[in-house]
């Protein structure tokens, strides 16, 4: 609840001055403390003069002796036939609570109830009270009275006001009587709270557009509540109710003129407020039987609950209506006995049961009609009469639900009264009693029903410190109960309450709800499912986030007529709505409601309506992105740029409009116009799909999905592109049809989205997207991980953000908030900029109507949806939607066309003559279109290499040939797909150049996923890799194999076949065209840096330098799972380089980066290829062991007789034979160290190959590979795996190298070594010198 005011409600009673008739006015209004004080003084003086004949003991309160009874007058009665039983039930509840304490007050003083003399005129409540005062001078208080009329009469009596009597728990039906008066002690919440509970339910649950309010004028009941009702409904943007009002009369006739005026509005909810009387009873009968009102919800106040119950079931038993569960909903300030969680109700049941059995004062025959209705329509079985008192009590409670609730209300008041009499000094006289009652009292009844705080006059300091001032009522809450099978049941979350700091609810308002409405197309199952998806998603999101800023309600309306007008009527006729979500149709203009992310059964162009806000990609945006990213689409199967659009079920004007926009997109990016085919709705699109082209299909149906799948299975190069709306609607059908098809088919069904991948539940995806984390936590069921559910969650969150903004600026329009904010971010997902309006300048007028805001749109395939490790097809793009004319040469003049025609014949002859020569000359030419050629623009270079290729060739020669061929095919296909350029290959290594850093990164990541998914036809490669890792465990103390100890399931998900490492770097290069190779090559620092980056990576790992990483846009970086590896040292680089691991396959673990310490360092002018550089000579003198050490000793012994220079020359044939590179010697390295380094390197190679060949036969079966002592320049290096691995990335580790200035010599695939002085130490090569 919201409380705007903290001032208590106080009454400056005109009746205190003896002015007659004032009671019929509203007696409650705000007044200052000064005014209140003045009026109290004046009133006191007037009262003194008016009651000079009253005994003085009345004012001060006579002091009672310690054994004298505590006298209380029972004024809880009514003389009306309609109200007498009502008041009787309240009194029995009060009496049962006093019976429970033995009618005993403090120090054993008996409590004596004074019953009015039946011979007196009981209608004159003032006379009844004055007579009791006269007969019992120590009378402490009055219980009651019953009804607002009698209470008003008491309050205008000067004698009673001056007596100091406390009126305890008066039963009133209108808030007009609730005001500060020190003689009144209310023990029920004010009736205004009942109105608030009703309005809350109407706004949040019924969401009814048409309400009615029925009350009687001329009495306190109704007038004040009608005013409160209108104020509350206006604050929630609800229409004011239709009104039936008639003057109170003893006549029971219904004013049919007033009733007809109300009934003709066809109210959905009718609130009835009034005195329980014959006039109200007749009105209820008319309401429940008139066809205009009989189906409406009936909401009586608590005072009318019993009467409404009886009339309803009397009509049912007479055959005039059929009871409907939940049609009758009553307000109350206490719970019915069916509420299971309330402790005080269990206490009530026990005390009232004992009271019934022991006193016999409860006569069930008084309410026999209620019992008869329950016996016929209720769920209880009447227990046979017996001596069992428990059965008797249980029968009574079951068969008298309304009487029981009245008894509960009375019992709560009686229990509070009993507590006020529990201390002797409180009840010495009326003055002491009243002082106690208003001394900041709070009461707890039955352990959990709280009343209070009650407080009297106090100053501002006390109020500031927390005191409750001028407060004579203790209830602060109300609830609603629904009537189901003659049983009252509390409606969950129907209650309202306000802070106990405030005495009355004046100024307390209800929070505005956020109401969603979704249309359910009942005759179209897929469209209906989309609507239900929105309802489920929004409700679940609200529950998960525990959103309580305002009530959020998601309702649905079933529709069969799907014409725009019918849908408009469905939205606007019956329900209060803020937001319309889900499926809509073109032309359904629902002005006044926000329509975010509309889903169209037949996608169409943006509707320029201010309240339509497109959060998902529009058709125009998707067509723009299609041509902007057409090269990526073409690369899937390497087809040309021809686009064929198929429009299914569109009218001719829509075909023309959509075609025009698509052609503008094609012209903007200098592509030829698409071909267009319109397919009628009576056919499927199968026959219209074009072979070998990109098919852009709109309005896909379930039958179309089957045609598309069959078409793609047959056509190996064709591609089908669908839009986001069709994806949402047909997603279940698409996934079901494609999940069993080959990946090559799944990869050729492509769509658009600006959402994170809904099916990606990996940790890296959650780390990159807050929206995805919330989505999967709120909806953990994998069947709900669909684009429809995710877009619904996002839409709901967007609208909730707009509601918060609207409330903060006291606006009623969510649409206004969208354009006021312009750019909106929800769960870190940006939208906008939304603009709507015109700007006028002295010379011109500019208008912008921009109601769409999707950003970061990507293209992705169904393959990626089924397998999140597959990269998305394109980088994120926020289309500018700036169209340009196609850029091409001017048309030929007529003369030029004539000359061209004349020359065609000659040209044909020439072409035929030179065709053979041209073909011959062009056979060796390379396609250089994709090569970056501008030396002023940065180029991104990739280097790749296969891990342990030498060892694999030695161990599996019969398999490696096919494996290398497959490796080359995969990489070359991807190079073409991403528009990159193959510079050269050296052995199994690739050098690749890309114009775009994102293309390079996407290429590198997809290399890993493609190789993972490739069918290698053998497991021998994986067994060999695992054995290589295990062989290192015994060699290195803290080495932990990254993959060898994985379970089969884990390994199969992360690794398969050849392991390729990739290094990426971006920078400026020296670009040269090679006349021999007829291709472009790239030289300089960028090439060297990329090669060195690849050299430090592990197999299956992609490492990018910070230059490559920051060359990506913010959106591109956000879409890439990565691990920052910190600064790393690279050979030949005089500074540490920040490295980033790209997590192409989530879950892979790698050894630490291969930043080995070099000792054999070439001269500044030395160069080497990327692969050779990665295996430079190690500082291995005295460090190698095992077989390699033995081989090195033999070599050293054999060559020892020769001088050092001759030894180096004699080693060259052996080095060449074993494929070991011999880089030039650096000036910083001695000849002896250089010689020993060459022999060590040769020894390691010999040991590796010989041991690898032993255990693996030609059939591919592997046995234990004992290679723990072998090391190679590529991977079989004992230092390469040093350290342990970490999840999803290699541990950052610095090499500690000291760099020297790099060489200026350009080289495409060679690397400079880092200069480092190796300490002098004796070696086998200089044994002779040592002697």
Swiss-Prot record:
One of its GO terms (cellular component) is membrane. It is found in: Membrane. Its cofactor is Mg(2+). It is an enzyme of class 4 (lyase). Mg(2+) binds at residues 945, 988. Residues 1-33, 920-1331 are cytoplasmic. Binds 1 Mg(2+) ion per subunit. Glycans are attached at residues 255, 429, 558, 574, 657. One of its GO terms (molecular function) is ATP binding. Residues 55-898 are extracellular. SMART domains: CYCc (SM00044). Pfam families: Guanylate_cyc, Peripla_BP_A-cyclase, Peripla_BP_A-cyclase_1. It comes from the Eukaryota. PROSITE patterns: GUANYLATE_CYCLASE_2. GO terms for biological process: cAMP biosynthetic process; intracellular signal transduction. Residues 940-1094 form the Guanylate cyclase domain. The keyword Nucleotide-binding applies. Gene3D superfamilies: 3.40.50.2300, Nucleotide cyclase. Its EC number is 4.6.1.1. Keywords: ATP-binding, cAMP biosynthesis, Glycoprotein, Lyase, Magnesium, Membrane, Metal-binding, Nucleotide-binding, Receptor, Transmembrane, Transmembrane helix. Could act as a receptor for an unknown ligand. Belongs to the adenylyl cyclase class-3 family. This is Receptor-type adenylate cyclase B. It comes from Leishmania donovani. The gene is RAC-B.
